[in-house]
Swiss-Prot record:
PANTHER family: NADPH-DEPENDENT 7-CYANO-7-DEAZAGUANINE REDUCTASE. The lineage of its organism: Bacteria, Bacillati, Cyanobacteriota, Cyanophyceae, Synechococcales. The active site is at C50 (thioimide intermediate), D57 (proton donor). This is NADPH-dependent 7-cyano-7-deazaguanine reductase. It is found in: Cytoplasm. It catalyses: 7-aminomethyl-7-carbaguanine + 2 NADP(+) = 7-cyano-7-deazaguanine + 2 NADPH + 3 H(+). Pathway: tRNA modification; tRNA-queuosine biosynthesis. GO terms for biological process: queuosine biosynthetic process; tRNA modification. Substrate binds at Y72, E73, L74, H91, E92. It comes from Prochlorococcus marinus (strain MIT 9515). Its main location: cytoplasm. The gene is queF. SUPFAM superfamilies: Tetrahydrobiopterin biosynthesis enzymes-like. Its EC number is 1.7.1.13.
Length: 136
């Protein structure tokens, strides 16, 4: 009895890798533009790599926002976030890049991006970025 080959022997990217590589943030129309409401999204498995050591960095990202005319589509957001997993980038740069991309994709009234990086070498880091004015 032979064991099935779980890896693509042609070295082509697997379908999940292709989806991540091609990812972009997709939005859809806000279903209730007249109502002021807040959406929170938790992404607990964010990863990127330290630009100095190459070691992986892990974080939980939290996005809180008040939509304007567009709302983030969650699967596209998940794939977009996953494309950072092999990128060598500082915490500060990656969080600012994500915030820029979120703003460009949906232009929410207000947004708060929180990144809580796991400790490495007995040091942890949290970043918070805000944009816009919260509406009541």
């Amino acid at each position: 009895m032979s064991t099935p080959n779980l890896y693509d022997s042609t070295n082509k990217p697997l379908y999940g890798e292709r989806l991540i590589e091609e990812s972009k943030i997709i939005c859809f129309d806000n279903p209730n533009k007249k109502r002021i409401y807040e959406i929170s999204i938790e992404l607990p498995e964010f990863t990127c790599k330290c630009p100095f050591s190459g070691y992986p960095d892990f974080a939980k990202l939290n996005i809180f926002y008040q939509p304007n005319s567009k709302v983030y589509e969650l699967k596209s957001l998940k794939l977009y976030i996953n494309h950072f997993r092999d990128l060598k980038i500082s915490h500060e740069e990656v969080v600012n890049r994500i915030m820029d991309d979120l703003l460009n994709a949906a232009a929410p009234h207000w947004i708060h991006l929180n990144a809580d990086f796991n400790p490495r070498g007995n040091v942890s880091m949290k970043l918070d970025i805000y944009s816009g004015q919260k509406r009541n």
